[in-house]
Curated annotation (Swiss-Prot):
Taxonomic lineage of the native organism: Archaea, Methanobacteriati, Methanobacteriota, Stenosarchaea group, Methanomicrobia
Location in or out of the cell: Cytoplasm
PANTHER family: SIGNAL RECOGNITION PARTICLE 19 KD PROTEIN, SIGNAL RECOGNITION PARTICLE 19 KDA PROTEIN
Gene Ontology terms, MF aspect: 7S RNA binding
Protein name: Signal recognition particle 19 kDa protein
Gene Ontology CC, one term: signal recognition particle
Superkingdom, taxonomy of origin: Archaea
KW Cytoplasm (keyword) present: yes
Keyword Nucleotide-binding part of the UniProt annotation: no
Length: 101
């Protein structure tokens, strides 16, 4: 059952190693390599999005890989929230965050 007011963030959405057709929804410049559920959860927590982790779920485009997913508060467009989460993970990893253009 779908939770009202929640967005689903799959690791594939922000994974730099995935193509757009494989599920990535943000640019390669803003995405990160192989994001983990715990990193997504921590970044969403820092952004005040009240994350809920569901580790047993599999992304429909790659149903054979159990990657898990994170439910976050719906505070705007999914692509914007995914980008914010990816940039927060980059900061946590100590990577350079691209300048706004």
């Amino acid at each position: 059952m779908k939770d009202k007011g929640k967005l689903v963030i799959w690791p594939a959405y922000i994974d730099q190693t995935k193509s757009r057709s494989s599920g990535r929804i943000i640019s390669r410049k803003n995405s990160i390599k192989e994001p983990h559920l715990n990193e997504i959860k921590e970044a969403a927590r820092q952004l005040g999005l009240n994350p809920e982790v569901e580790p047993e779920k599999a992304y429909p485009k790659s149903w054979w890989e159990v990657s898990g997913r994170v439910l976050v508060d719906d505070n705007g467009p999914k692509s914007v929230i995914a980008k914010q989460i990816a940039l927060a993970i980059k900061k946590m990893r100590g990577q350079e965050v691209p300048a706004k253009t």
